[in-house]
Amino acid sequence: MKHFLTLRDFSKEEILSLVNHASELKKEPKKLLQDKTLAMIFEKNSTRTRMAFELAITELGGKALFLSSNDLQLSRGEPVKDTARVIGAMVDFVMMRVNKHETLLEFARYSKAPVINALSELYHPTQVLGDLFTIKEWNKMQNGIAKVAFIGDSNNMCNSWLITAAILGFEISIAMPKNYKISPEIWEFAMKQALISGAKISLGYDKFEALKDKDVVITDTWVSMGEENEKERKIKEFEGFMIDEKAMSVANKDAILLHCLPAYRGYEVSEEIFEKHADVIFEEARNRLYVVKALLCFLDNQRGRE
């Protein structure tokens, strides 16, 4: 069964097809999933992700069932595989936002319904789909290639963007503090994909070098959910990595800024630059709705072929 746990399991053609279908559904909404049911399991808080999934299945003609970790017997020690067997047998899709990626993998092994990663500590693939759709809408793909800079932590967004750029043949430059490292296994996968796609990938510690000649600038919060106790240390380590006017002046003249939100002005991005690019950032957030619609339809079609 086809799940959506990471974009590394998807081909270039499948990824671009999802983006194109999202564009179609944004222009012309359709009830393509009449009476289908989506279970939404959250171990972490969510604003945009929950809204995108709940509205997506509803507007497609289906229903959403919200389940926090406190609602489930998982919180009392029930094995993930037992919960997966029950929920996966009752619904058509399962969306999960989890603390550990291994929880997703275990759930997917036993679920009869396709499982969607709505964020883990390793990957955030639905966000990158929304980013890709936004890049397309803002005409920042030339001949199918985008020039991207990612400035920030070696986190789930960095991993997902590295993998996606490698599969699609993009040019991506990543900049982060010297003591931050990308997983060797993820880096090796990206390098192998780049040999196939022709992607140009670079990793360094100078944000200005990464920003040169880029049309798309991506940043993310320095302190992810669950890292609140590390806030003081991380802010100190990321000093100098803020996206401000000076930083954006190094990118191409009409470059856009993307941020998955929530944004912390004065840290990863300045107030002035955030507001200057607010239109694209909040359209990026809205576009999550349409890529989720496309994703649900894709998984439903895949399941129907089995």
Swiss-Prot record:
Positions bound to L-ornithine: N156, D220, S224, M225
UniProt entry tagged with the keyword Isomerase: no
Record-linked Pfam families: OTCace, OTCace_N
Pathway: Amino-acid biosynthesis; L-arginine biosynthesis; L-arginine from L-ornithine and carbamoyl phosphate: step 1/3
MF (Gene Ontology): amino acid binding; ornithine carbamoyltransferase activity
InterPro entries the UniProt entry points to: Asp/Orn_carbamoyltranf_P-bd, Asp/Orn_carbamoylTrfase, Asp/Orn_carbamoylTrfase_sf, Asp_carbamoyltransf_Asp/Orn-bd, Orn/put_carbamltrans, OTCase_ArgI
GO BP term, example: citrulline biosynthetic process
Lineage: superkingdom: Bacteria
Subcellular location: Cytoplasm
GO CC terms, sorted: cytoplasm
Family: Belongs to the aspartate/ornithine carbamoyltransferase superfamily. OTCase family.
NCBIfam families: orni_carb_tr, PRK00779.1
Subunit (UniProt): Homohexamer; dimer of trimers.
Protein name: Ornithine carbamoyltransferase, anabolic
Species for this entry: Campylobacter jejuni subsp. jejuni serotype O:2 (strain ATCC 700819 / NCTC 11168)
